[in-house]
């Protein structure tokens, strides 16, 4: 089925919410049979604030109108799209099912899609609603908010290792031989470039934006399986250090470096927090940080950037790639975001609009050199991941079970759409220290955009041949 780019219901008005929060205690105070003062008002405000906010949010998410009706919905019944089997969701026959209730039932194999998951999800506005359910409110208040407030270093380590140390094969079954878990870049829209081409395009673009040269000291924060570290060392002759908290990734990346003939004196993967890298401040003149900062958390974001600033040389350059959300969100965006936080990226609460990210970078004394918005490129990348995952269904189910297969199938299918329609995006930001002595003129030749020419011949890396022979 072709895409159905229908608009959903928009976000609520903060002004209206504020009126409800402040007027509610006042009205309640006025109907009391005795006189009260400001002290009683503020007591009522503290007691009624959360219930009023929850009630307002739940109501507006349920009755809010679509932004526009330019794309007509087919108006087909729920059972045209999904098989409800004998689940409790049969109560929603003849009306739309809340998306949170549907995806939880799908993960538990209580419902099924009638057809390809991505195809049916394209028509989700015809059969699903994006209202805030009691389960979502419970998750926000008991999990999300406490994690945002606390977000400790120990929490980062536990969540990252729980996620990324699940098993290299789990990720290989959708990431493919490059083992890169960040957005690739489409260079030729007249053909369907392979996943490997998209990732090679991205890694080369990052190195070109860094103006990477032989002998440069490069740090890749959150290096994953070491693919960019290997690419930069092999093709640009840089001295590259990658850091990751995941033990499996560090071992895999180290093997990849050696397979490509990169000695430890030129390329290495360290399994540690980037703050523990054994080098003095200003040691690295090139830093890359690709889709790792989301895990830092909102509370620590500014501190994180200042720590990265200290690692960068005064004449150095950083490419900072981060996933983000749109400012004028729709309720669908929040429901999807909470699903991602609960099931896919726990603790990754720092996916925020571009303006917020830029402000944080500038507050840490970085100067922005360029910004590329890669949302549609992310959609293209995830679509290839989705196809890979589907093709490996039997292997995934045999080792990890049907539930993990379904969670990731839903995640990948929905993320293709979310990235394509602008709910989520990826921002690739090139920046440097905002110092008077920084030589900005010398930076102009490397002021790269997506389609800038490449300065050298790029050689593909070898991809852990022994590992892939075992997976075949």
Where are these regions (language model features)?
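A short acidic, Gly/Pro-enriched loop at the edge of an enzyme's catalytic core
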Residues: 275-287
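Conserved SAM-binding loop of SAM-dependent methyltransferases across substrates and taxa
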Residues: 225-236
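Conserved SAM-binding strand-loop segment of SAM-dependent methyltransferases
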Residues: 261-276
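Substrate-binding/catalytic lobe of Class I Rossmann-like enzymes that use SAM or dcSAM, i.e.
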Residues: 323-441, 445-447
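Feature captures hydrophobic
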Residues: 1-199, 205, 234-236
